[in-house]
Amino acid sequence: MNVNEIINKCAEKNIQLWVKDGKLHFKSPQGAFGDELKQEVKANKEKIIELLTHKEVNIVQNNIEEEYIEFPVTDIQASYLLGRNPGYLYGGLGCKIYAEFLTEFTDENKFRFAVKKLVERQGMLRARFSKEGKQAILPEISKLPIEIYHLENETENDINREILQKRNQIQFKQYNPEKDIMFDLVLFIINRKKSVLCLSLDMLIGDYISIDVLMNDLEQIYSNQQIVPLKINYRDYITYTQHQREDINFLNKFYEDKAYWKNKIDLLPGKPEIYTSVDFTDTESKTFFQKKYTLNISKWEKFEEKCRKYHITPTAMMLLLYCLTLKQWSKNKDFLINITVMQRPNIHDDIQKIIGDFTSTTLFEFKESDSNSIKEQATQTQKILFDNLTHNAFSGIEVLRELKRKDKESIIPYVFTSTVGSGNKENILQKRQLLYKISETPQVLIDCQVSKTIDGVLVNWDVREGVFPRGLIDEMFESFTEYIHNSVFDEFWENKLMINLGSNTRKIRKKINDTEKLYENKNLIESFFLRCRKNPDRTVLICGEEKFSYSKLENIAATIQTRLLENGIKKGDKVGVLLEKGGWQIASVIAILSLGAVYVPIDASQPKERIYQIVNQANIELNIYQKKEERITEKDIRIDLHDISSKNGLKYECFDSDVSAYCIFTSGSTGIPKGVEMTHAAAMNTIMDICSKFEVSDDDKILGISNLYFDLSVFDIFAAFYANATLILPLESRKKDVSHWYELCTKYHITVYNMVPAQMEMFMAYLQVNDCRKNVPRLILLSGDWIPANLIKNIRTRFPKTQCVGLGGATEAGIWSIYFPTDKMSETDRNVPYGIPLSNQRFYILDENDNPCADYVIGEICIAGKSLAKGYMNDPELTNNKFQYIGQINERIYRTGDLGLYREDGIIEFVGRKDTQVKVNGYRVELGEIENALRKYKKNRKCSCSEK
């Protein structure tokens, strides 16, 4: 190793070297000074002493002889060059700024001369860049990048149109670093005293402060003011920084800062996970748009006053408000922000007068806080920011490289840039009137910029076009500016942040949840008895070849009811139903409900142990069964399908619609099924609304392929009674046979399909090879699982005139609670959206603190309204856990465990599950129940289930 390498190695190991009284001294952490390095130091001791003793103080010096020799780019410049490559995420463009100023450049010749002298003075205006990561200053350029337009005789409208046209041409102009002059000046002379100057500048050649330098120089030269020649140039500064990195003091600081960041690296979060448009690809969007907000001088002074009171810098406070806004829309609440650092070291009097890129970056980790107030969060923010800036010898770019080495997220596209308090006595925007500005940066999605202006302080977001859904940024920026507005009040600082949804969002949510509709107060079987009196001979049910009129079904129900009464069944009792599909199954349900009792449908094919669990959990009095082996308890009733022997008519107990009607058991995560106890009123609210919305009537024939223990059957049965429609059931032996469905549809001209998507996909596949002209339904209801867009396309192709509706919700909320007509789908929808609430039902998407989520923020879907279940039968703990009153929204809600988000139009999108629940053909299956069942066997004591 040479001497510099030895010194570098010592610094890396935090070994300090110094000379005192002509002798070399060192201080080393324990174990850092290994034998090999000691030998190197010992062998080169005299040279090290000489270097440390006689090394000149590193000062920036002008090297006129090497002015045009190429020199290295900075880390920031290298990242800008890399970002121009469209192969990188969010790349494909340069970093540049476009600005328009109101100026007094009204003499064309003087302006051309001023620009010529400006280009001669500032070497970086003549810079070129190579593919190898080098830059060089050209001795001269052949043509000045100037355009001048005389608009003295134009109207104001014409002037504005001309300027806008030019703005659209050059504000996002992309320069070729290897060939182009990297800036443009366009001057519009309006009259003898006023002009508008448009500046387009690639920030490879100059940072934000460089615009100030450019305008100052231009104004001085134009005004014939004495302008002192520069004693150094940008190349001299880069040479200085290269030498600086070899200095022992810098090396000690560099490795100290590197250790600081490496100690944090494993704890650093990723970028904010804010929803992006599903149709966005990183190569499509090459432009930015801007949202801006100006604090006038009075407001800014009040803002500064509050910051001083709480000992917080304005920059730290603005950063916190920006992060709090991002947090509200981010899936992850801990994230990284890129901070732009204005870094012009005080090493020469001319350092503030040079055009060039002096910026650096650092990272800021925002973490969700348990703080009780904004002031505590602001203090924490300021401390982290100060600590990170103090360790900036190891730059943000270098930290990102370390993250990449560890296969962690290394593109942080959310940026914060503040020139408030940057050290400049004056800022460009404070001295001249800015009419318009916008910047663009590769691999950046939102750049929050804070800068002083002639009017106060400008806060703007430069946002990459096409990345976010329309309206999202408007809502975010509205909340951000409201936080700024509120920060001039002590109450804001002294309390926790109150989540603020934008006014438009609040308006849309209120409208979407305004679902109140007056329906009759009916129970589930009231309509059945009405039809029995009015239309006793009308066919209400067909199963296979067997038809059931209202009177026939009533007689069968009366036979079953007699047996129930003989066994002491009364109002409120729970009765299990284990019958196969058919008239006797439906009649059993009618018989049970007529007594005010509760029917509990049970799958007779499931393991006996699970049936026992259901019987015990529901406190079932007796079960109605058909096959001898299905008997569960001594009191159970076996049905003879050929015995319609009751001499008594079907009794109908009058009861309130708020009493329980049925209890459907779903999979439980503890291994024990949970029974959802539903009232007549809750189920009827959904049934009446679906029949009303989609005009289900006595002309309809409903295909009822769902099992009784699946809540879609509740609609099939009782919608038929309510609407006087006909219910068509498949034979039990062929209920899963698609060809049997086809036969039924062909024979009976079924008009309403009520299926889960998997069933519909099977049916559509069958129809592709069979004539479906006689099987054209009027209405298709799909629910129970994701509904793929391709399925809807197939349905539209096969049945172009059929109304198809996606439905969703939970067994705990009365069959369905939400709907979406599929004819309203967009081309970009990969699945049918969840939709909007049904009548008298309301939806909320809540975060972990039960606050409403902003648009496109994933949270838990919660349902409120008239269709909510009573709870889980005989399980008050689970009921209290899942059915809760939420003060923030003043509602009793059911926590579905489903994850979703609101679009900006109020439509809800289903995203997935919070837990391990999965859907199998529409049925809810808790993986925990499967695991608990497996663990009962010795070989499976340690097992886990996952969805594949």
Describe the predicted segments one by one.
Residues 425, 508-509, 623-653, 683, ...:
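AMP-dependent adenylate-forming
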Residues 722-725, 750-754, 764-833, 842:
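Gly/Ser/Thr-rich phosphate-binding loop
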